[in-house]
Amino acid sequence: MEKVMQLKTIKEYNDYMGVETRHPLVSVIEGSRMPHPVPHARKHVGMYVIFLKELRCTDDLTYGRRSYDFQENTLLFIAPGQVFGHEADGSTFTGSGWCLLFHPDLLRGTPLGRHMQDYTFFSYAANEALHLSKQEQQTIIDCLTKI
C-alpha cells in the first residue's frame, strides 16, 4: 500500500512545493516560480485546493480512487480531507499553471463557510474539471495575482 503524504496546513503544502508561506490561511502558487522540481506523491490535504492547469497533462492525476478528467485551461477543485496526486514513483514535476490554497478556518463563521458543502465541484463525485475559455482563464489569473 502506497504511503499518502499528510499536508494539513498551508505551510506544510508550501514547504512541499518549495515556496514561501506569506499567510497561514491562504496561498497562491504560480507554478512557473517554483524553485525546483517536486517529487510526485499522493497527498491528503487539510485545505481547499483549486488548480488552474494551463497545459494538457499526460500523467493521470487521481482524486480519491478515480482519475481526473482534464485538458489544458481547466480548473480542478480539491476539498479538505481528500486525497489526490500521482503515484510516488520517484519521478518529479515542474510547475506550470496556478494553485490557490485556502484553509477552512478562513471561512469559519462566514456565510460562505456554512455553504461550502453546497458546491459539488469540491466532491469526489465531481472528477471532471471545469474547462475555461482563454478570456475566463485570464480573468482567473488576474484575480489570483491580486490575492
Q: Model-predicted segments: where are they?
A:
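Generic protein-terminus/edge-of-domain signal
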Residues: 1-62, 66-69, 128
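A hydrophobic/aromatic-rich effector-binding and dimerization subdomain
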Residues: 10, 20, 87-147
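Histidine-centered metal-chelating micro-motifs
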Residues: 58, 76, 80-89, 107-108
